[in-house]
Regions:
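Polyanion-binding surfaces on beta-sheet-dominated domains and ring/shell assemblies
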Residues: 1-160
Length: 160
């Protein structure tokens, strides 16, 4: 089974693209959760053989603990993205259009909840930037992403 999550962002700043990545993670997790609950996404050892399918096999019901364990095998870590920027030497988080269009340097950071980077995309549009400034951008992005992971967990808590 394959799931495609498609977010068409036709005209947007970095913050909108990052928000769509973060929202797509929630959509994917909810879709997987629903497939597991409906018996359409089962652990490998519980999947029917072709012969069982032909003979009227019924999907087993997983306990809530089994569902959560399987969900975490399917999607081991949540994903989020956030934008950061450097404007006249100051570091900003989650740039809106005005900040994004005035940024000397802007960066999109995509990361997993276990702390692994998926993407660091930064551009010195109006200026170059130092290693120290890069570290400050990443540190602020990391703090913002930690907050997004907390929000994602709160949203997903209790939703089946």
């Amino acid at each position: 089974m394959a799931l495609n999550v498609d977010c068409d962002i036709l005209n947007a700043d970095g913050g909108t693209r990052c928000a769509s990545i973060t929202a797509a993670n929630l959509a994917l997790r909810l879709a997987v959760r629903r497939l597991i609950a409906n018996g359409q996404c089962l652990p490998l050892e519980m999947r029917p053989t072709d012969e069982e399918k032909k003979s009227g096999w019924k999907a087993p019901t997983l306990t809530p603990e089994q569902q959560m364990e399987h969900e975490n095998r399917v999607i081991p870590h949540d994903l989020a993205a956030i934008s950061v920027g450097l404007i006249e030497g100051d570091v900003y988080l989650d740039l809106d259009y005005v900040l994004d269009s005035n940024a000397d340097v802007d960066m999109n950071v995509v990361k997993t909840a276990d702390g692994k980077y998926v993407e660091l995309q930064g551009t010195g549009e109006e200026s170059t930037f130092s290693g120290e400034e890069l570290s400050a951008l990443i540190a602020l992005a990391d703090a913002g992403l930690d907050g997004l992971f907390e929000v994602q967990a709160a949203i997903l808590d209790g939703i089946n």
